[in-house]
Amino acid sequence: MRLLTYNIRRGGVGREEALLATIASSAPDVVVFQEATEPAVIKRLASGMSMAHCGAMPRYSLGFMSRIRMAHVEWHRPRVSRHAFLELAPEGMPVRIFGVHLSAVFAAITERRRMFELRALLRSIAHHQHGFHVLAGDFNTVAPGELLDVGALPRRVRAAMWVSGGRVRWRTIQIVLESGYIDAFRTRHPADPGLTLPASGPQVRLDYVFLPSTHAARLQQCDVIRSESARAASDHLPLLATLDVS
């Protein structure tokens, strides 16, 4: 199964042709969207890809489209979290997909919020912890040990960091790893920075796919899509993971 996670920025309005070209070039079976605030756009993208199954919940920002029929689709919002997550169960397959979009802005207070949201998500899916599942989406945070060139970031991002004291302890991804997951991209590309934002000249990696280390053998490949259309379609580059779902 080819799984694409893609933040399409502000619903993708006005950029559908570039989005469609980007998605088509990666030939996914399932796409998980972030900032999917315009259901009509998701429907048109699904139609353009001849994908019969799609959905979006504007207030939760998460959507999907798929060639594969889904046995179960649900948007969850943990009671203690501001952000929802999307649950997809492809029919006849042993995998469950959880679409994620954590709070934005690089600041100490928002990193603490992301940690809170992530822990709420992990508690909510604890009954799946031993099964084959995937966390995919825009985590809006930096992985441990990775460098961030603050000077190259947009002014609004630098301003948020300055307000928070200029220092952010990047703990969210560490929590994922300590919870028994592997970072799909980093597993396949130890030396590739894998930067995904901004798409026109990436400076930071915010988009991830994780799966339990007990199912690491099911990961076949994971790549950032760096096509010309991807640089124009959104402010994020999409991430494609290929999984063995036999």
Residue ranges and their predicted role:
Residues M65-I68, L86-M93, L211-S213, A232-S234, ...:
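Active-site beta-strand termini and strand-to-loop segments that position acidic
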Residues P39, G48, A52-R67, R79-R82, ...:
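Active site of divalent-metal-dependent phosphoester/diester hydrolases
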Residues D29-V30, F132-V134, Y208:
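Short, Asp-centered acidic motifs that coordinate Mg2+ and/or phosphate
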Residues V30, Q34-R112, F116:
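Structured beta-strand-rich core segments of catalytic domains in phosphoester-bond hydrolases
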Residues R9, T37, H101-S103, F139-V142, ...:
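Catalytic metal-binding/acid-base residues of hydrolase active sites
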